[in-house]
Every structure is written in structure tokens, then in C-alpha cells.
């Protein structure tokens, strides 16, 4: 107990009455001689004020003073009040510092004059209470630690007892101790105790014992020291075993403890995999508690990330279907986000990818593309982009395609990048998808995307590829070719042929220009935008590169930025072939001195290059001057040789060029040429030129899209940041779209009645280029 003198000293220190009186007095205006304060250096005024301007302030103070003490007290009453305050000083201090010691209902008069200004004792109350609680907690903490330290050896023995009742009681006590921080630290510092808890949890058949022991481990797992103790005591296999428990509380404790271990304990991932944790976790995906599912899916993501074996185990356990069901069923944002993260990791696995697609993953992920959660939308887009190359044959994609077209207008660069990439793959070799995208304004949206993207090739390249797919081989292809022009897309498309565009983007743009040239209305605008000189420039550069490599003894095709220069040669020549259908374009092409180069390309060992070279020469040879120039360059010999090509498209174009070159030749020459053409073009089934029937050339046949080939560097994947080390792969699909206006797969060359009828032969040529030219409308 405090002594009387201590209390009196405290009272003196904290008594506000005297201080308040002095302070209040000091605030009043009074006659100051200046001896003590030096406030005045002039004689005071007659009113006794230091400054006559303070009249208003003084009046206000006097008013407030009168308001506060407008009732009169006699001397006896004042002495009585003063006595009451003096008697209750100790109670006021006690009420502030130790309120629990006061008798209930006891009234203590307050010395507070102004409610806005607490007294010294009141200001002391809060910190004194905090100090008291800290001291109490320290005493309790020490007591808990000492109690636990003394009890742990005994409780360890009881947990190992043969009597299950004793074990249960001990487990309950340990669980209670683990709820307090001091005793929890004592438990985790005892390897014997942690081992006993793990062993008891693993071996017990009692539900309550399992709940208490798993709950204890859960409490320990909130500390790094506890995680290490659980790991060293073999807790992970035991916890994995508990994932098969029918009791929800045990399941929750087990999965959350494993989650903490996977997040923070080194070596935990491998231990969980070895204990069969993946299979157990996938089996738990049929539960309905959304928070439990969120933790479980996050565990799966941690285990699968960067580990191919884990991805295959999840696949074998039926994981893709279960994960897709979650995306289709629930609305809890955190669960959808964690599930989409697992699917994103699995979507770069070539084995899991088709399984997710077959389970309806594309449609399920598409449901959340308009969710307000940006992290969920972004994960769904990344996953869809990774899956999209395996989903080109999927049905029921209308809703997804419409949403993707809308997302092209987003201000988020990542969203636009993913949406363009997904559209590029989904429109590849899929007639219905092409129609749908065109019908929902996809052409306009893609052109606008290219215009907005500037030099961001991670956006422009997939957008150009999508346009390339949409402008070829479907019912609305011609409308799409016109729409690109009508939405002011031609200038920006031609501009992409120039620096700083890289070869992959240039390759895609060349293919798009070739498709746009299938529409006669685009011939003049493309010419006016300078497309022809730039195509010739690219052709010359690529051809020189291939020639230089050949002269240095290189036999294998080399890649520049993932693109073979032979592809650029083939693509530019093919685009010029289609553009040459216009007479004015032919004049420009011929004026750029291209005929010698085209003749040289006839000697290429690559059949596709032979065919496009023969094709462009066939168009140019319509003009007599060009036909003479072709002959002057010595084209007769290579063209005659190509008549015997196994590629029927090459042979047909070669025959057409030779025929056009023979227009002004003597009749004997024409007859000899007729015999040569007949014997060459109808080797397997001899017939004469004047026999009716089709030549049967399957020049326009569409090839199947080539699958993903990791050994082919031309197959490139888009990466937008990626998720850790797992590639955000967009495995491109090759699409053979060469003929423009023909929905059917075969475009036979009509039978020609007589070699002398030039126009019949010309009319028999395929209206479009051969679809065997796999370069166009292909990968991203």
C-alpha cells in the first residue's frame, strides 16, 4: 500500500485546482508595473489596462467568468466543497489507475472544469492502464511458459500412453496450451512433444483426439520454428493421411497446416508429393466449402508450378475436370482466382491442355472475363491464351468470341494482348469462329487495336495474324477484305512492312496483304500506299540472305528472329502474284526489274518457292512485253524442267507461262510444245489437250493444321511476363489459307480443248493460289 506521504505528494503533483487558478489569473488583463514581466515601458492608462485595444477581449473573459460563477457561495459552503475534493483525491487517482478496486456504485466528484480539457489525472489514466496490462501479461506469459515447461515432459508421456482415454485427455490439454503464445513456444521447442503429437494424430481412431492433435499442429504452423519442428518430426505424411478424414474440422486443420508448410518450409513440397498429397488434394475438390476449396487449390498451384511430374499426377487424378467444374459452379472470388492460377500452370502442359479444353475449360474461363476482379480476369485470359491453340475445333465458343472482341477496346495493355492472341488462334482453321468474329465487329475492333498499338508488336502481331485468318476462306472473307480498307486499315498494315517491325510481324503482314489483294477493290489502294516496292525490297533482301548462306556452304535453313528467310521469299512472291492480277500493278512490278529475280527463283530447291515464282510469272506473261522479257531471261529451260515437277501446281503454272510465251511463235513450235505439255501434265493418265474433262489438280486443297512442334523454331509462343518459370505458351497452329473466294476444298483446273486457245488455258488456272502454301495464314 502507498504511504500517506506518497499519496499527498501525488495529490500535490496532480492537483489541478491551484494550477488552474493561477493559469486563469495569468490569462486576465491586470495592471503590470513591468518590474517582473517587462510587459510595459510606458505609463499605464487611466483604465489600468496595458493596451486599450484589449477592451473587447476583456469583456468576453469577464462575461465567461460571470457565466461560470453566477451563483453565490458563502464561506462555509466553499470550505465544505474544498473539504470534499481533498477527501476524494486518493479515490480519483485510484479510479484512474485501478478502477477495479472501487466499490460498485461509488460516486466520486470530478474536478474537471471544461469537458474539452481533461484533468491531469484523467490524462494519466490511459497510459497507466496500458502499463498495468503489460505487467499483467508479462506475469501471465511467464506463468504460462513455466507451467508448460513443467507440464510438457508429463504430457509427452501421457500422449504415449496405451489407454486411449488418457491420450485423449492429454491431447485436449496440449491443444489448450497451444492456444497461448508462451506455452506454444514451449511445445514447439520440445522435439519429443511434437513427435508425440504427430504420432498420436496419425495412429488414433478417436475423432476428438484427431481434432485436438491436428489443431495443435495448426497452431504451431503459424511460427517458422513450429513449421520446422513439424517438418523434422515427420508431420507431413501424417497430415497428408489426415486429408482422408471424414471430419471437416480435422480436414481444415490438416489442409491449412500443409498450406503453411508449402508456403514457408523448405523441402515441404517434395515431402507432400512423396506422401501422395496431390492425389488426396485433387480428391478433395468435390467438397463444397468455398474457403476450404480455395486453400486446397492454392496448395495444388504451389505443388504444380514448375514441376511437370506434379502436373501429370493432377491430370491422372482427374484434376482438370474438377477444376473446370469449380470455375463453372462457384462465385467466390478468391476460390475462382486460386483455381484459375492452377489452370494457368496446367495450361502450359501439353498433356493437360487438351484435357482442360475437352472438359469445357474455354467456355468456363470465358464466363469470368467481365468479372470486376482484375486479377481473376487476367488469370483467365492468360489461361485461355495458353489453351487456345488446342481449342480450334471446339464448339459453342460464340459467347467467348464476342467477349474477346469487346476486350480489344480495353485500356489495359495486358488484356488487349491476350485477347488478340486468343482470337488469332481461335480463328485459325475454324470456319464458324471466323464467321462469328466478323459478325460481331471483329474486323473493325482488330484494325482499331493495330492503330492504337503503335509499335507494340506483342499486340500488333497477334492482331495482324487474326486479320489474316479472317480475310481468307470463309463465307464473309470478301466482306472482311473490304472492311479492312473501309476502316482505314490499309495504311497502317503497309506501314508495318517497314522498320522497326521485326521479321515475325513482317511475315504476318505479308500474309495479310496477300489475302487483302484477293479483293480487286484493294489493288489500287495497296499500290498507292507503296506496298509493291516494299514487298520487292523485302523479297530481294531475304533472297540475298539465302544466297549468301548457300554460297558459304550452309545447307540448313537459318532462322532470323524465329523466321526462315525462305518463308519471306515465298510470302513476298506469293503476295506479288496476287497483286499482279491488276494491270497497273503488273506495270509497277515489271518496272522494278523483278523478272530476273523471279526467273532465278524457278531454280529454288523449295517447291513452294518454285510455285509462287511460276505463278507471278504466269500473271506477268499476260503482257506481251513482259512475256518477251521472261523469255529473254532464259526462263524457257527452267520452266520446261518444271513441267516434270511432282507438284502439280508447279507444273500447271510452268505450262501456262510457256504457253503465253509461245503466242507469237510459229505453229510448228506450238505443236511441239503441245506434245511436251501433254506428255508432262498427263504422265499417269495420257490424254490430249483437246479431250474434255478436268485436269484433276487438287491445287486448292486445304491441309490440316500442323500440331505444336517444339523442335521447330518457327513455332513461337507469346510471353507477357509469364507466371514464374512456367511459359505462357501460345502454341501456334498452321493454317493453309491460300485461295480466297472458294468455300470448297478442291479447285480443279478445267480441261482445255486445244493448245491453240490461249484463253482457255488461262481460264483453267486456279483463281487463287494453292492452299498447299502453308506459309500464309498460319502461326503467330
Swiss-Prot record:
Keyword Chaperone in annotation: no
Tissue specificity of this protein: Expressed in the successional lamina, also expressed in both the epithelial and mesenchymal cells of the developing replacement tooth (at protein level). Expressed in the enamel organ as well as in the inner and outer dental epithelium during replacement tooth morphogenesis (at protein level). Expressed in the differentiated, polarized odontoblasts that line the dentine matrix as well as in the inner and outer dental epithelium during tooth cytodifferentiation (at protein level).
PTM summary: Phosphorylation by gsk3b promotes ubiquitination and subsequent degradation by the proteasome. Ubiquitinated when phosphorylated by gsk3b, leading to its degradation.
Locations listed in the record: Cytoplasm; Nucleus; Cell membrane; Cell junction
GO molecular function annotations of the record: alpha-catenin binding; cadherin binding; nuclear receptor binding; protein phosphatase binding; transcription coactivator activity
GO biological process entries: canonical Wnt signaling pathway; cell adhesion; cell-cell adhesion; convergent extension; determination of dorsal/ventral asymmetry; dorsal/ventral pattern formation; ectoderm development; embryonic axis specification
Function in brief: Key downstream component of the canonical Wnt signaling pathway. In the absence of Wnt, forms a complex with axin1, axin2, apc, csnk1a1 and gsk3b that promotes phosphorylation on N-terminal Ser and Thr residues and ubiquitination of ctnnb1 and its subsequent degradation by the proteasome. In the presence of Wnt ligand, ctnnb1 is not ubiquitinated and accumulates in the nucleus, where it acts as a coactivator for transcription factors of the TCF/LEF family, leading to activate Wnt responsive genes.
Record note on quaternary structure: Interacts with adnpa. Interacts with cdh1 during oogenesis and in the unfertilized egg. Interacts with ctnna1 and cdh2.
Name used for this protein in its record: Catenin beta-1
Taxonomic classification: Eukaryota, Metazoa, Chordata, Craniata, Vertebrata
Amino acid at each position: 500500500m502507498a504511504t500517506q506521504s506518497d499519496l499527498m505528494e501525488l495529490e500535490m503533483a496532480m492537483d489541478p485546482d491551484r494550477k488552474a487558478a493561477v493559469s486563469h489569473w495569468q490569462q486576465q488583463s491586470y495592471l503590470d508595473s513591468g518590474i517582473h514581466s517587462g510587459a510595459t515601458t510606458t505609463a499605464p492608462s487611466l483604465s489600468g489596462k496595458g493596451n486599450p485595444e484589449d477592451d473587447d477581449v476583456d469583456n468576453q473573459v469577464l462575461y465567461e467568468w460571470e457565466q461560470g460563477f453566477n451563483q453565490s457561495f458563502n464561506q462555509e459552503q466553499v470550505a465544505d466543497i474544498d473539504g470534499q475534493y481533498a477527501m476524494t483525491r486518493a479515490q480519483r487517482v485510484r479510479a484512474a489507475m485501478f478502477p477495479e478496486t472501487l466499490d460498485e456504485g461509488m460516486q466520486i466528484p470530478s474536478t474537471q472544469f471544461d469537458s474539452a480539457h481533461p484533468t491531469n489525472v484523467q490524462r494519466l489514466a490511459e497510459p497507466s492502464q496500458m502499463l498495468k496490462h503489460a505487467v499483467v501479461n508479462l506475469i501471465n506469459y511467464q506463468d504460462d511458459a513455466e507451467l508448460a515447461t513443467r507440464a510438457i515432459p508429463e504430457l509427452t508421456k501421457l500422449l504415449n500412453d496405451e489407454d486411449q482415454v488418457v491420450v485423449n485427455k492429454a491431447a485436449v490439454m496440449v491443444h489448450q496450451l497451444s492456444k497461448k503464445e508462451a506455452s506454444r513456444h514451449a511445445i514447439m521447442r520440445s522435439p519429443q512433444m511434437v513427435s508425440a503429437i504427430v504420432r498420436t494424430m496419425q495412429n488414433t481412431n478417436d475423432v476428438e483426439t484427431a481434432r485436438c492433435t491436428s489443431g495443435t499442429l495448426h497452431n504451431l504452423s503459424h511460427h517458422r520454428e513450429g513449421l520446422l519442428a513439424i517438418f523434422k518430426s515427420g508431420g507431413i505424411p501424417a497430415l497428408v493421411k489426415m486429408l482422408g478424414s471424414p471430419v471437416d474440422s480435422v480436414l481444415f486443420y490438416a489442409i491449412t497446416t500443409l498450406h503453411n508448410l508449402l508456403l514457408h518450409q523448405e523441402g515441404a513440397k517434395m515431402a507432400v508429393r512423396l506422401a501422395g498429397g496431390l492425389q488426396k488434394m485433387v480428391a478433395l475438390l468435390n467438397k463444397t466449402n468455398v474457403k476450404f476449396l480455395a486453400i486446397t487449390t492454392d496448395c495444388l498451384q504451389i505443388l504444380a508450378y514448375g514441376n511437370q511430374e506434379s502436373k501429370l499426377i493432377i491430370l491422372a487424378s482427374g484434376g482438370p475436370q474438377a477444376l473446370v467444374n469449380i470455375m463453372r459452379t462457384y462465385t467466390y472470388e478468391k476460390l475462382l482466382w486460386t483455381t484459375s492460377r492452377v489452370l494457368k500452370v496446367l495450361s502450359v502442359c501439353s498433356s493437360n491442355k487438351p484435357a482442360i479444353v475437352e472438359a469445357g475449360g474455354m467456355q468456363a474461363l470465358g464466363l469470368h472475363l467481365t468479372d470486376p476482379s482484375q486479377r481473376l480476369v487476367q488469370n483467365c485470359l492468360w489461361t485461355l491464351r495458353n489453351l487456345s491453340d488446342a481449342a480450334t475445333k471446339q464448339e459453342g465458343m460464340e459467347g467467348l468470341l464476342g467477349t474477346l472482341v469487346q476486350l480489344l477496346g480495353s485500356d489495359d495493355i495486358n488484356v488487349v494482348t491476350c485477347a488478340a492472341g486468343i482470337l488469332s488462334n481461335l480463328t485459325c482453321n475454324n470456319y464458324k469462329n471466323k464467321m462469328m468474329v466478323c459478325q460481331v465487329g471483329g474486323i473493325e475492333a482488330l484494325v482499331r487495336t493495330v492503330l492504337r498499338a503503335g509499335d507494340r508488336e506483342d499486340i500488333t502481331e497477334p492482331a495482324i495474324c487474326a486479320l489474316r485468318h479472317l480475310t481468307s476462306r470463309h463465307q464473309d472473307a470478301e466482306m472482311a477484305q473490304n472492311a479492312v480498307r473501309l476502316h482505314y486499315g490499309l495504311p497502317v498494315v503497309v506501314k508495318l512492312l517497314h522498320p522497326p517491325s521485326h521479321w515475325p510481324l513482317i511475315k504476318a503482314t505479308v500474309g495479310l496483304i496477300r489475302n487483302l489483294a484477293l479483293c480487286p477493290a484493294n489493288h489500287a489502294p495497296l499500290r498507292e500506299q507503296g506496298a509493291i516496292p516494299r514487298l520487292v525490297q523485302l523479297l530481294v533482301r531475304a533472297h540475298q540472305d539465302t544466297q549468301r548462306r548457300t554460297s558459304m556452304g550452309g545447307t540448313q535453313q537459318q532462322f532470323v528472329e524465329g523466321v526462315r528467310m525462305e518463308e519471306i521469299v515465298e510470302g513476298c512472291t506469293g503476295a506479288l502474284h496476287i497483286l499482279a492480277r491488276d494491270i497497273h500493278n503488273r506495270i509497277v512490278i515489271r518496272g522494278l526489274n523483278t523478272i530476273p529475280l523471279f526467273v532465278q527463283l524457278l531454280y529454288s530447291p523449295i517447291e513452294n518457292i518454285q510455285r509462287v515464282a511460276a505463278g507471278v510469272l504466269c500473271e506477268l506473261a499476260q503482257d506481251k512485253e513482259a512475256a518477251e522479257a521472261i523469255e529473254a531471261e532464259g526462263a524457257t529451260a527452267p520452266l520446261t524442267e518444271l513441267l516434270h515437277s511432282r507438284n502439280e501446281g508447279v507444273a500447271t503454272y510452268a505450262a501456262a507461262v510457256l504457253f503465253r510465251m509461245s503466242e507469237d511463235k510459229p505453229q510448228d513450235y506450238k505443236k511441239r510444245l503441245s506434245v511436251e505439255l501433254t506428255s508432262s501434265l498427263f504422265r499417269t493418265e495420257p490424254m490430249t489437250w483437246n479431250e474434255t474433262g478436268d485436269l484433276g489438280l487438287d491445287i486448292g486443297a486445304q491441309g490440316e493444321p500442323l500440331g505444336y512442334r517444339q523442335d521447330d523454331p518457327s513455332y513461337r509462343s507469346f510471353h507477357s511476363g509469364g507466371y514464374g518459370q512456367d511459359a505462357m505458351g501460345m502454341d501456334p497452329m498452321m493454317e493453309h489459307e491460300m485461295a480466297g473466294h472458294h468455300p470448297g476444298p478442291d479447285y480443279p483446273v478445267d480441261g482445255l480443248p486445244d493448245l491453240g486457245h490461249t484463253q482457255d488455258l488461262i481460264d483453267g488456272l486456279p483463281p487463287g493460289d494453292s492452299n498447299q502454301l502453308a506459309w500464309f495464314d498460319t502461326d503467330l
